[in-house]
Amino acid sequence: MAESEEKSEDGLTLTFKIRDDAKWSNGDPVTANDFVYAWRRVADPATASDYQFFITTACIANAEEVTTGEKPVEELGVEAADDKTLVVTLSSPCAIFDYLMASGACFLPLNQKFVESCGGNFATSADTLLADGPFKVSSYEPSAMKVELVKNDQFFGASDVKLDGVEFSIITDSQTAALSFENGDLDIVTLSGNLVEQYEDDPRFSTRSDGYNWYLTPNMKKEGLDNVNIRKALAKSYDKEAITTRVLKDGSTPMDYFVPQGLATNEKGEDFREAAGSAYDSWTYDVEAAKELWKTGLGELGKDSLSFTLMCEDTDSAQAVAQFLQSEWQNNLPGLTIELQVLPKKARLEYMQKGEYDIGLTRWGPDYADPMTDLDMWITGSSTNYSQFSDADYDATIQSAKKGDL
């Protein structure tokens, strides 16, 4: 999209030249103003974007003040010098700026005229979506189980696009997905559980790491879960090894940390996981230690029992893991009752973002190849910090790391 980039000596001013042949799928030119409008829209607290925190992660000038409503969006450090020149001002040099630009939809441009013409219906159907990439949406409804893309002839690299289109089917049942694959309705399908064992010797079968972390997020505003010993007891009383080998059986590996192996390396080629090591044992499976922590926590709360609801989405894998956790917790922690609440992913996320849940089973995948993609989720006020964890020292450490002060 940009044909050139210039960086000032202090690394605080970045100037991008937009390609002259960059066009929207309706034929309108892509301009620098499209980026200014889009970034301001993400930063605007009224938009309530899930990825608003990316604006601050990128160290864009005045990002924190704009996203918190202390300053107007017009003061965000992004402007159009002319139709094809985008100027970005940073509050401090950002080592991962290029990663961020290439990773998140929040930094893509938006055609302001088109967005405003759609009103509240923007991005709810194929007719209210506009593309500037190799494909455009030809069929999509919010409740549909299929999204169809076709080649975008207005794309500046259209001659290099070899596919006429791509079709995505949203299938929550693994058996149904596998049957569709066998019938020739799908070219690629993700397998889990017993289906992995069924297909692992098939020449069409292959494995790869998707970098996603499945994790539990307790709502720290809920009674009982606001107690650190109760949370530690929950963390230590289920067997992650058993989840990967007996429940999922899909090549997943257990982790006692959040930044996975293979995500990023330093200038010496050392993997972050090796450099960071493991500083805590709170997540290590140890039933006897968990029982002691549980007993201590109940005593501090003045209770002899607790009841929580575990929320998960309606996929086979998520439900199987949730059922395993329910069994482990109730068997290992006397006086604990766990109810399961199964919801479609969209509904689950809405409840978790509003803080209307007890314990959530959710997942997170890396947006860019740097540990910060996992670490700044937990800063105070982050839209992905469902647990409402808040620690001033942690916030300060993350902020220093972003600026390169550590």
Segments (PLM) and residue ranges:
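N-terminal lobe/hinge region of extracytoplasmic solute-binding protein
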Residues: M1-E9, L130
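Surface-exposed binding/hinge segments that line
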Residues: K17, D34-V36, T47-K113
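Alpha-helical secondary-structure segments
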Residues: T31-A38, D83-T89, P93, P134, ...
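Gly/Pro-rich hinge or "lid" segments in bacterial periplasmic/extracellular proteins
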Residues: L90-V161, G165
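Ligand/substrate-recognition segments at binding pockets and active sites
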Residues: P142-A144, V287, K291-P366
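Ligand-site clamp/hinge motif
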Residues: D153-Q198
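Extracytoplasmic/peripheral linker and loop segments enriched in polar/acidic and small residues
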Residues: T244-T245, D281-T284, G335-R348, T373-L406
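Structural transition elements
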Residues: P254-T296, T315-Q319
